[in-house]
Design a protein with these regions (language model features):
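Active-site-proximal segment of zinc-dependent metalloprotease catalytic domains
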Residues: 5-13, 31, 67-132
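Short loop/turn segments at secondary-structure transitions that flank enzyme active sites
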Residues: 9, 64-66, 92-96, 136-138, ...
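Conserved catalytic/binding loops enriched for acidic/polar residues
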Residues: 139-497
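Fold-level signature of zinc-dependent metallopeptidase catalytic domains
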Residues: 1-48, 109, 497
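Solvent-exposed, polar/charged alpha-helical surfaces in well-ordered, non-transmembrane soluble domains
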Residues: 15-22, 26, 116, 120, ...
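The catalytic-center signature of Zn2+-dependent metalloproteases
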Residues: 41-61, 116-173
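Sec-exported extracytoplasmic/periplasmic mature domains
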Residues: 22-33, 127-128, 132, 167, ...
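Carboxylate/His-rich catalytic cores and anion/metal-binding grooves
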Residues: 25, 32-90
């Protein structure tokens, strides 16, 4: 197979694209082919166009506000299913992203996040053209410490380049491992072996397929992803997580991000520069904290789904509720890092610098509100996790899964949320007030929603009574008292109705 790198590709990254294309040879060797894939650079004087279907081309584009960094479409023979052509597109914003990684996290000749990112992105898109789908469970192969140890991971710290993996960052005091995978993972090699090895017998295929429940080969794709609140059940199938202990990894990641945010003025606010990059990087890192915590929230009410053949893998069950201890650990991290009074606190001098460049184009959505919209930002991050935990499907699953092992019931879940959101004697920040009000609205809405089961509704009813009692307070400043009076009125009205 020959893949051509379009001649419009920036010269400095061409070697990385070539490396990403030919990186698949490691997998094809397992299938019995040596040098199965070759990458070539399209000559500047080529007499053929990159859009010519006769050529498999990795093209380069600069689309305004692209949704993805790359696309890996292919053309298949409708009669046989055979893939006959590939036309990969990679976006210029991928290079910008790589240089941002360098600027934030540093780089060396031996460990360059820009190089690894482009190699990984290219391998991912080439993988699609070879017939592979996304595998979002692949990140669960190593624990939160092993994932940084290249002596264990080699050139791939996840099970597949077909995952949507974030940049891998080692916490303070730990050597930096791979930023991104630069070779096929165990799942990739296994899938290519199954799909491309010539002359496989039925017994050979059965033997290969029997490995599907082993940790290095587990698979979950888009239709199983827990990306939106209440959708799907297996927390391993989440886009953008890392390690088989996402709780520990997320706790480490938040410390790393918080430390880096404090360094942003020294990195970006230098002579002759506007604060645009400073602003966008601050928002990006803050949202990243929310995304990781959102992934942790999926453990609450989660069920591991293992697709097995009944006469094989008898030591594995199709459904396994996430252990109680892990759900409680997940809740504790969410309480401390997402819902607590000091989960989001910002230096006023820092915030004053969050100015964007003035653009000539009119933006109807902003309507001149160019000041930092921090409360919307924080509530959006908190609300996403809360929306998942309180989703009627998740509440029902907590109850249903109690029949096969779950012991973390809705009443305890809501009690833990109450303890984090309403703290006796605490003067809530304005961020916390927003959270409290939104949480109360969510409970009131749930109480009147027929999609909730009766056990969950009774827990919601009980929690609202606790909030009604809590908000009869006389301490705090005027803003606090007015806020709690309003919450008390909302809850009382809902319960009376």
């Amino acid at each position: 197979l020959v893949y051509w790198v379009e001649n419009s590709t920036p010269e400095e990254i061409r070697p990385f694209v070539v490396k990403g294309i030919e990186g698949w040879n490691k997998a094809f060797e397992k299938a019995g082919f040596k040098n199965a894939i070759v990458a070539k650079i399209q000559p500047d004087d080529a007499d053929w166009d990159a859009g010519d279907v006769r050529y498999n081309v990795v093209r380069w584009a600069s689309t305004p506000d692209p949704r993805y960094s790359g696309y890996g479409p292919s053309v298949a023979n409708p009669r046989t299913g055979e893939i006959i052509a590939a036309d990969i597109v990679q976006e210029f914003n991928a290079i910008k992203r790589g240089y941002t990684y360098r600027k934030l996290w540093g780089y060396s000749e031996d460990n360059d996040p820009l190089e690894q990112w482009i190699v990984s992105l290219t391998m991912h898109e080439v993988g699609h053209t070879l017939g592979l789908r996304h595998n979002f469970k692949a990140s669960w192969i190593y624990d939160a410490k092993e994932v940084h140890d290249v002596s264990i991971t080699g050139d791939n710290h996840i099970g597949s380049v077909m995952d949507y993996d974030p940049i891998n960052l080692a916490p303070k005091g730990m050597p930096q491992g791979n930023y991104f995978p630069t070779g096929p993972g165990s799942y990739d090699i296994w899938a290519i072996e199954f799909g491309y090895t010539p002359g496989l017998t039925d017994e050979d295929r059965e033997n290969l397929l029997s490995k599907s429940t082993q940790p290095e080969y587990i698979f979950g794709t888009d239709g199983d992803a827990m990306s939106s609140p209440g959708v799907n059940i297996d927390p391993r199938n989440y886009r953008g997580d890392m390690s088989n202990d996402p709780i520990t990894y997320t706790a480490d990641r938040i410390e790393t991000i918080d430390a880096k945010i404090l360094e942003l003025p020294d990195i970006y606010l230098v002579d002759g520069k506007t604060s645009t990059e400073f602003r966008s990087t601050f928002y990006s890192l803050t949202r990243e904290k929310g995304r990781f915590l959102d992934g942790v929230s999926r453990l609450i009410g989660g069920v591991y789904s293992n697709r097995i053949v009944s006469d094989k893998n008898k030591d594995i069950t199709p459904f396994e509720a996430v252990p109680y201890a892990d759900q409680k650990r997940a809740m504790k991290l969410i309480q401390d890092k997402l819902l607590s009074n000091d989960a989001f606190s910002f230096d006023p001098d820092f915030i004053k610098q969050l100015q964007s460049e003035k653009r000539a184009a009119y933006s109807p959505g902003r309507r001149g509100n160019e000041d930092p919209q921090l409360h919307d930002l924080v509530l959006g991050l908190q609300g996403r996790a809360i929306s998942h935990i309180l989703h009627p499907t998740v509440m029902m699953r907590l109850v249903d899964s109690s029949q096969y092992g779950n012991t973390y019931m809705p009443d305890e879940v809501l009690s833990d949320l109450f303890d984090a959101i309403f703290v006796q004697g605490e003067v809530p920040s304005t961020f916390k007030m927003n959270l409290q009000s939104t949480y109360v609205d969510s409970l009131i809405s749930a109480l009147n929603d027929d999609d909730y089961d009766e056990i969950s509704k009774s827990a919601i009813y009980s929690s609202l009574f606790k909030i009604k009692s809590f908000t009869k307070v006389s301490y705090g400043n005027t803003t606090t008292k007015v806020h709690y009076n309003f919450l008390n009125w909302k809850v009382s009205k809902a319960l009376d109705d």
